[in-house]
Regions:
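Glycine-rich active-site/cofactor-binding loop and its immediate structural neighborhood
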Residues: 124-140
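Acidic/His metal-coordination segments adjacent to aromatic residues that form catalytic metal sites
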Residues: 118-124
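Low-complexity, Ser/Thr/Pro/Gly-enriched N-terminal "stalk/linker" regions
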Residues: 1-68, 93-113
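Well-ordered alpha-helical scaffold segments within catalytic/enzyme domains
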Residues: 73-86, 135-150, 184-197
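Hydrophobic core segments within long, regular secondary-structure runs in both alpha-
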Residues: 73, 89-103, 135-138, 142, ...
Length: 231
């Protein structure tokens, strides 16, 4: 996770969370004067020109790079359940602090769009893995909570879930979409089980049953008179 493993390609995952956390701090300090980035990125992966000196304000890696943390923290949770390790837990807590500092006030937490431009979030559900990243974050948060009883990451996952729940559904004015890559559905069921909040399982049910409904959501996005940018 620290990008210092000899011979291994850097992940840039924690770099991205730190950059998003710094931007978030700047947003809070400047208030209404803060000018958010506008989405101009083109491509599925971004790498620094000089790997030894990445720009501290930019996103690097694949669009789903956040999941490196999520899968790691899930593994940490399972490990701590069977093999308590104070040092590993402290390392995980420090990483969680960084991740949670990147979360926007509305609950959104995906560094690809936070750093590249929130004006395009939820516009490419098919390819850009936002709900996939969300699902892995939830599964990691649940595993870590069940192992340690610590709620910080779980609460962040709930806030992200609440934001998604406010944006998606069959009602007019909501997005009628669903994940391009499934995992959010079963993650939401786990979140409902651990929190007792049935709205999360209801959201999972919506995603399951909305997929395949005619007209197909992704086809509409590709064929509409003003299709969204697919890059």
């Amino acid at each position: 996770m620290n990008d210092n493993v000899p011979g291994a390609a850097p992940s840039y995952c924690m770099h991205n969370f730190k950059a998003a956390a710094a931007q978030n701090a700047e947003r809070h300090e400047q208030g209404k004067a803060f000018v958010p980035p506008k989405y101009t990125f083109r491509g599925f992966e971004a790498l620094p020109e000089d790997p030894a000196n990445p720009d501290p304000d930019k996103f690097y890696g694949f669009v789903f790079q956040d999941t490196d943390f999520s899968k790691w923290i899930e593994a940490v949770g399972y490990s701590l359940t069977h093999h308590p390790d104070a040092e590993l837990e402290a390392t995980a807590d420090a990483a969680i602090d960084i991740v949670c500092a990147a979360q926007l006030d509305n609950g959104y937490l995906d560094t690809y769009y936070i750093l590249n431009g929130m004006d395009r979030h939820f516009t490419n559900l098919k390819d850009h893995h936002e709900l996939y990243c969300f699902g892995h974050l939830v599964e990691g948060a649940v595993a870590y909570y069940e192992a340690t009883g610590k709620r910080k990451l779980l609460d962040a996952a709930c806030r992200f879930a609440d934001y998604i729940d406010s944006r998606f559904g069959t009602e007019e004015g909501r997005l009628h979409g669903y994940p391009g890559h499934e995992i959010a559905e079963m993650a939401l069921v786990k979140l409902a089980a651990v929190t007792g909040e049935t709205r999360y399982s209801d959201l999972a049910e919506y995603f399951v049953w909305q997929r395949g409904q005619q007209p197909l959501y992704f086809c509409l996005l590709y064929t509409s008179p003003s299709p969204r940018d697919l890059s």
